[in-house]
Every structure is written in structure tokens, then in C-alpha cells.
Amino acid sequence: MELKDKKILVVGLAKTGVAVTRFLAQAGAFVTVTDMREEEALSDVLAELSDLDITYELGRHVPYSFLMADLIVVSPGVPMDIKPLEMARSQKRRVVSEVELASWFIKAPMVAITGTNGKTTTTTLTGEIFKACGFETFVGGNIGNPLIELAESGQEVSRVVVELSSFQLEGVESFRPDVAVLLNITEDHLDRYHSFQEYIDAKLRIFENQTADDFAVLNIDDPLVAACASKLKAQLFPMSRLHELEEGISYRDGFITFSHKGKVLRFGTEGFKLKGVHNLDNIMASLASTLLMRCDGDCAYEAVKNFKGLPHRMELVEEIDGVAYYEDSKGTNVGSVVKSLESFDSGITLIAGGKDKGGSYEPLAPLVESRVSHLVLIGEAKARMNEALGSLTDTHLAETLEEAVEISRRLTKPGGVVLFSPACSSFDMFKNYEERAQRFKAAVRAGKKGEA
């Protein structure tokens, strides 16, 4: 689509909206930006865009602007079912996401990764493998830089790796990755979606425009993921920790085996720095994606062995008086916390809670009952979590994260583990999950210094 002189409306002025606005303005479009927040709340953002000739509609959405736009680009934080967007679609206005817009201007081969959990680790590792194997690589999307920044920069790259949330996938039309990865699906974001099926449908849009020339990497150990295999137009490339595969990538007895069209590569896992059963899925997905896109096996293996993982994902903070403190603030849904709890056999003090996302906490029940010695709950969700899980183990309610850490310190015996894995978002008490993580680390280290 030619952007010059087109009337384009950008909905939402968070990080992605700012990047889209800058790209469109520099492409010669007539850009209007709308956000429900008032000007005072957006002062920093507006300063970033002060050099551009654009129109602002703040504190409200003006229906006329939606109806007159040649194109509407929606930021991922804005629900697609708000009334102005529904009205615009009913009048045949074109409504897309930033990822869709960016894809029109990016020609390099692309790996796109989605799933409820593990996206960021898999995306980062995939990018590291490509770079180690000599490919000029852009890594972005839901992680780090919006994809549109690659289009804006004009940077020549030979590989693109993009992490995609369900929100970003809602607004795709023609977006077509060469390799699309679906890691897992568990309940999440039910505070935004009307049903779990609606969330699943958003995830599956990653495969919508693929053809038989492309690959779909599916974790067939997840029944919801496996169920979509029959609907694919791309070539299925399965991954599994439970089954040996003649075609695909699988794990058995300390080795990952990649099998594709008669080519077989085996990788020992003993030297991997990235620990945890759940990370085997992330590693297999990264290896599958990069090997399918012409990475050398030895080079890819070395990159995996050297990858240490990311902060806020099962990060060991300190070991104090024989107790290990793990920070897993990125564990914002139940499925993620299940994976984290499975990394320990028993003796866990679990700190959980935050802003309730509307899903069921019942999937945690067997692990809480069998492995969690003490449960400490915080935040807006603590009452509902206590109702679902409180009777299964020794349970305590705390008003602050710092109080939760102090309670955990008193309760946990040497040899035990304090795991902060919230199963909730952070927005009831913190700006984001990073701030929540830093507060947990500070509280842990304050105890080490005897300040608590």
C-alpha cells in the first residue's frame, strides 16, 4: 500500500503507537493519533513526536476520524472490539495491527513465535543462533523493538525473528512468516477476550497466510496445539519431549534429535546453561526454526550451549541461610507457574498473586498440594486464589510484596526454595513486571543484609 498522502489513524500511543506514528509521518501520510488518555498523561510521548506534523485527538475517540481514515493502525494494547473500530469495520475501513503494517515493507525471511509461555526466551535464543551463524538479524515484536522500527530504519537484514502476542495477531491480514512457531496454549488474557476459544483463535492467526512453502513448528505435546495441525497449509514440523519423531525435533535420554528429509542431527543437553524442563521446549523450537532456515548444526549447538537465559524467568536471586530465592515475575499466567513449579520436587514456598486475569487457578492445585509447603498470596487476586488453593497447603495472606518475602523467610527451612511466580499481571501494585521483579530482589537482599 502506498502511504504518501493517505489519511491514516493510529489508535493508542504506547511504545508501538509512537513507532508507527513516526514511520507513517516520515512516509508522507497525513497522520492522526487518538488515545483515551489526556494530554497530561502523555507528555513524555508527545515530546518524542514533537518534530512531526501530526494531528492529536486525546482523551476521546472521534468517530468521524475512524470513518474518514484510509487506514487504521491499532496498537496491541487497544482491544479490537471497541465501538469506534467496530463502526469503522462496518463501513469497510481497513483496520490492521502494527505487525501487519510492518510486514508490507519487510522482505527478509522471518521466524514468528507465539504461545502463552516461553515466547521471549525462544525468540531471543532464535535470534542468538542466527547471529552466531553469521546472519544479520533483527529481533523484535512483542520483545524489545516494534517490528515497524525495522521497516523505518531501512536496515538490510538476512533474518527476522519476531515475538507475537495474541493482541498483535488480531489485526493481521496478509502477514506470512516463513517459519511460524506455536509453543503452547493455556488460559490467559481472559480479562480481554470473551472466551478461551477467542484467545486460541487469535493465536492461530499466525498460520493463516502460510503456504506449502512455509513451515509450522508445533509442540504436539500440548493437546490444544496438536489439534490445529490438521488445519495447516504450511508443512508441519512437530516437536515433542514425549515422542520420538521420524520428521521433527524431539528429546529422549539427554539428547535432542532433529530429523528432516533424511537429515538427522543429535545434540547432547548436558552442557546447556538454560535449565528447566520447560526450557527444553524453547530450545527445541529455536533449533528447529534456525536449522530449517539453513543454520549450521554445530554453530547452532554452540549458541544454545552458551545461552544463559533471560532475567525475570526463573532467575536465582540469592541463596541465604540455605534457602534459594527464585524470581519469576514474568510468570503472569497459570500455565507459566505450572512449568516453574515442575522444576522443583518439593519444599517450595510460593509467593503468588497480583492483578487477576480472569482464568481458573485450578490447574495449579495438584502441584500446590504435592510440592508447595507454604503459599503466600498478595494483590488483587489473593482472595480468589485463596479460595481455589488455600486449603491445599499452609497459606498466608500479605499486604505487600515485602511482607510476603519476610513471611517466606520465616517459614522456609534450609534446603527449601522461595519461588516468586505470580500467575497474575503486575498492574494492581506495580508499573510492570520488571518493577515487580526489582522490588522482590530488593526485599530478598534486604533480608541478607539484616535490614528486614
Curated annotation (Swiss-Prot):
Record has Ion transport as a keyword: no
GO biological process terms on file: cell division; cell wall organization; peptidoglycan biosynthetic process; regulation of cell shape
Catalytic activity annotation: UDP-N-acetyl-alpha-D-muramoyl-L-alanine + D-glutamate + ATP = UDP-N-acetyl-alpha-D-muramoyl-L-alanyl-D-glutamate + ADP + phosphate + H(+)
NCBIfam families: murD
Main location as per UniProt: cytoplasm
Binding site for ATP: 115-121
Family affiliation: Belongs to the MurCDEF family.
The protein's enzyme class: ligase
UniProt-listed InterPro entries: Mur-like_cat_sf, Mur_ligase_C, Mur_ligase_C_dom_sf, Mur_ligase_cen, MurD
Entry GO CC: cytoplasm
Identification of the protein by name: UDP-N-acetylmuramoylalanine--D-glutamate ligase
